[in-house]
Amino acid sequence: MNKTLIALAVSAAAVATGAYADGINQSGDKAGSTVYSAKGTSLEVGGRAEARLSLKDGKAQDNSRVRLNFLGKAEINDSLYGVGFYEGEFTTNDQGKNASNNSLDNRYTYAGIGGTYGEVTYGKNDGALGVITDFTDIMSYHGNTAAEKIAVADRVDNMLAYKGQFGDLGVKASYRFADRNAVDAMGNVVTETNAAKYSDNGEDGYSLSAIYTFGDTGFNVGAGYADQDDQNEYMLAASYRMENLYFAGLFTDGELAKDVDYTGYELAAGYKLGQAAFTATYNNAETAKETSADNFAIDATYYFKPNFRSYISYQFNLLDSDKVGKVASEDELAIGLRYDF
């Protein structure tokens, strides 16, 4: 590793002497702040501003991002409420020019009704397998490269979703509708003014998952399944937490397309030490009988305040450069500062 990488790594570790490691999982978002609450109606605003420097082969790239979200709730009665949520993510990668590659991603847009027996929403929301990949997706930057989710199991639009918590059992289910298309007599997609009929794109599907917590033992297990068109997959995961230590594993298997088998597994470990959290993951996946992911990553996260942190993360890419090429087999160093609001 060249001197530039070493210098940046040392400086990133040195500047962060901060205060609070809020748990071992460093990848999630924090709760927002309530800006309005009256007569059973509340509005929370949250998000993050995150500066992220990525270095591969000594070359730098700006992967910085800002997320902003709004959560509104309205109490209908003692056991029923309405909910609406939006989150957008703005990224910038100008390549030395003025606003040439900026983008806005509408990550979530949904509304629904919740109560004693769970919450039902419609819109762009998470499928059911995200809570399973969360078992091992614990790092500030790297990780989660072997448990690939098909579209219907991930964050996608046109989705009817349910989640509920019943004691130690949490369940999620989602169904994505196929998208309507206007087509001509030959089946070609056209504008509605020139259409002969409606069709759909065949992208409907569903996902299911369940997580069970064994009381206060620190042991959790999870399982999930998803199916969409020619794609399907299942996931199994388990974790164990003991005071400041955390261990987890995940296995997934399925088809990413017709006759394209996919198998992957992830291992994760974390340790919380006062002001800091240290995490490590190993990811391995095989697609169509070829190794598509093979890496080991470590990171350290330091908290100045509960909502402000710095981190450094390094991924050792173990793919064979003779098989996948130099670019696809490069290691990566990432340095970041993150402010949550």
Swiss-Prot record:
Family listed: Belongs to the Gram-negative porin family.
Single biological process term from Gene Ontology: monoatomic ion transport
Annotated protein name in UniProt: Outer membrane protein U
Species assigned in the record: Vibrio cholerae serotype O1 (strain ATCC 39315 / El Tor Inaba N16961)
Regions annotated as coiled coil: none
Physiological role: Forms pores that allow passive diffusion of small molecules across the outer membrane.
PANTHER family per record: OUTER MEMBRANE PORIN F-RELATED, PROTEIN YDDL-RELATED
Subcellular location: Cell outer membrane
Membrane topology qualifier: Multi-pass membrane protein
Keywords: Cell outer membrane, Ion transport, Membrane, Porin, Signal, Transmembrane, Transmembrane beta strand, Transport
Known partners and oligomeric status: Homotrimer.
One Pfam family matching this protein: Porin_4
Gene3D superfamilies on file: Porin
Cleaved signal peptide residues: 1-21
Domain of life: Bacteria
InterPro entries xref list: Gram-neg_bact_OMP, Gram_neg_porin_domain, Porin_dom_sf
A GO-annotated cellular component: cell outer membrane
Molecular functions per Gene Ontology: porin activity
